[in-house]
Amino acid sequence: MGEYRQPRDIEIVKFMLWNYDFSKKTDIRAITAEFAIFEDIQVNALQGTLVLYDAVDLIQEFPIIGEETIEIEFRVPGEKTSIKGSFRIYKISNRQRGKTDTGQLYVLYFVSNEYYKNLQVKVKKSFRDMPVSKMVEKVFENYLVEKSNISNVWPPKKLLTNEESATQQTIVIPNLNPFGAIKFLADRAESVDNKSSTYTFYEDHNGFHFTTFESFMEQEPVHTYNYEPSNIDTKNPNTVGTKDRRDA
């Protein structure tokens, strides 16, 4: 069975909040009540939330206006390396105040910096006589990789997986943002390895990937799931009960 962990088992190494022009920063570990980071192979960039219990009115004094950068680093027990990344704050929830104290609770919503860069530029370019996977690499490097001089906050990310596509093609990208351009290219790609056209472009906590769904199915499973009808106990057919379970 896989090891079950409580949220408190996670070691928080860094929660550093920078203001919009990087002229000021503050450590918010002490006021972070909850955080979550979401990975999805059908979503291009990481997303997440931070729940802050603010008893020092940081939202006014810093201030937090929804254009900040958050540096996150945490460590899972038993893992050799920490998980870290820098993200853009794009939304702040309504504030909730307690009845018996002066603290206030609110949520900061964040996304990867590449999502912001994606909104700022367009790709209007022709690629000639090259595989689609190479075109995707060029779009990623030229339009999404952070080239800011604030390298300690925005270390450049990598396209860790770029599954090779078949045949040389000539394709004109018609003025799309980078994520749209990669989707446009993905729809025209066929894998060398499995003759599949199910390419997807996504980010996980390690970096970005351009790969097919068939490649996922060839990987070793992380968990084994057993499924049985929800209203029948196979050990005792006369008993009704939920039998979905996961073995890890």
Residue spans for each PLM region:
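Charged- and aromatic-enriched interaction segments used to assemble
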Residues: 101-246
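Assembly/oligomerization scaffold segments
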Residues: 1-122
